[in-house]
Each structure stands twice: as C-alpha cells, then as structure tokens.
A protein has these predicted regions:
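Short structured motifs
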Residues: 38-39, 78-82, 96, 142-146
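Terminal beta-strand-rich extracellular "head" domains
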Residues: 104-148
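Residues at beta-strand starts and edge strands
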Residues: 49-53, 91-93, 108, 157, ...
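Intrinsic low-complexity, repeat-rich intrinsically disordered segments enriched
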Residues: 1-49, 120
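Beta-rich globular "head" domains
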Residues: 77-114, 177-182
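Noncatalytic modules at the cell exterior or secretory-pathway interfaces
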Residues: 149-170
Length: 185
C-alpha cells in the first residue's frame, strides 16, 4: 500500500487484471437503486486530458408513466441517475446513449434530461423541477441503436430518464449505456 496517491515515472507495465474500483462515477438516487432487478453501475476514467464517464443501467424493476414523467421505482423520490462535476468528470463536451437491450414493459421512448434538484420522483413531470433541460430526445429505443447526446449535462445538475410517450407499466427488460466525454479545462 502506497497511501492515497502513487506516482510512477516512466512506463508502467501491469501483468494481470488492473482493478480501478476507486474510479466510481455518478451515484444514482434511491428511486433508481432500489428497483427490483435494477442494475446501476458507473465509472470515470481520466487519462491525459481526456475524461470518460460511463453509466450502465438495467431498467428492469423501474416504472414509466405519462409522457414527460420521470422514470424510476414506482412512487419513489430521488429517481435521478446522478450528477456530474468538473472535478469528477472534466468539462463535458458531448456524449452518447447506446441501447444494448430493447426496453420492454415500460415505455421504450426514453429521453435524457437534467434539473437542479435530486429529489424528482417517478411519475412526476420533469417540468415540475427547476431549470430542467432536455439533453436527448431519443424516440423509441431498440437494441443496437446509438444516439449522440447533443446537449451535454451542465455541471452539478441531476440527470433523469424521462418517458417520451405514455406507457404506465414496469420495465421487464431494457439495458442502456450512457457515456460522456470531457476534457481538462
């Protein structure tokens, strides 16, 4: 153990697995993390001047409702998927959403938004939150679709998955990967 920081001059060679468990990314609220069968994992890497943030979500156990409403565990507050900061994610230039499994049960039209508050609840209108901004209007997601995120998240805002159409049901399938690319400013 070398303490909290180690510096190596020259080239570092590693044989075997490199575990970067300390590279945790955004932390989701309980409206995402308490869904039955829901998976949320995130990581951040910083190499040179490039930052890469990844958020992996299995939607199983979350719920969708009316158009423009927040997705999360039914009736649960804090249904955000985390926040980004310049210190943790760099200055974000852009991103992409990859659908790895077509959403089923709940609505497949899943948009990405951010707002000031972390407390947004499932089934609440995203427009009920302060300073909300739509980052991505995806249309119906299908396995294999990759969509650019034209509006990157503003620093220290909370991100939400939001229904683009109305299907009041629980998700039984659906896996998405959200990635952001940032730089040292």
């Amino acid at each position: 153990t070398y303490g909290t920081n180690a510096s190596v001059g020259g080239t570092l060679g590693v044989t075997g697995v490199t575990d970067l468990a300390g590279n945790a990314g955004p932390t989701a609220g309980t409206g995402i993390t308490t869904g039955t069968g829901t998976i949320f994992a995130s990581t951040v890497t910083h190499a040179g001047g490039l930052w890469h943030t990844s958020i992996l979500i299995d939607l199983t156990g979350l719920a969708s409702s009316g158009s423009g409403d927040i997705i999360g565990k039914a009736g649960t507050a804090s249904s955000n998927i985390g926040t980004t900061t310049v210190a943790l994610n760099g200055t974000i230039l852009g991103g992409k959403l990859t659908c790895m499994e077509t959403p089923a049960g709940g609505d497949p039209d899943i948009d990405l938004w951010y707002a000031d508050e972390s407390t947004g609840a499932e089934d609440a209108a995203i427009t009920s939150l302060s300073n909300q901004v739509q980052m991505l209007n995806s249309g119906d997601l299908a396995a294999g679709s990759v969509l650019g995120i034209p509006v990157p998240p503003a620093a220290s805002k909370f991100m939400y998955l939001v229904t683009g159409a109305a299907t009041n049901a629980d998700y039984t399938a659906g896996k998405i990967l959200i990635e952001f690319f940032g730089y040292d400013a």
